[in-house]
């Protein structure tokens, strides 16, 4: 059964993932990535422009589909070897502000989960946000 997920990641890190065709969540932990399966969908929510910045964004910034079931490590620095998964991202999307998500009836359930960094959402919520992100 296909599942739908949200990952909470700063926009600059989302862009790296989209450009490289991969995802990372929860500061590179493998457990959350293993919960997703081939064919599952991921929305990225970016609270900020960059991890080390105070500049807020508060928007959904990318959407993609898990390509396979492989979770692997990748050395980004000698002391940072995070886990990743390969993702096929949708390229014809634009950021969707959090105000749009607040209009969905499930938002109150999901708003409190943003602090966890990765969580499952309903198909209906995913499609609501994804449709708002799609470029005409």
From Swiss-Prot:
List, alphabetically, the InterPro entries matched: EVE_domain, PUA-like_sf, UPF0310
Name the Gene3D superfamilies on file: ph1033 like domains (3.10.590.10)
Coiled-coil annotated residue ranges, if any: none
The protein's superkingdom reads: Bacteria
Q: Which CDD domains match?
A: EVE-like (cd21132)
**What protein family does this chain belong to?**
Belongs to the UPF0310 family.
Q: What is this protein called?
A: UPF0310 protein SMU_442
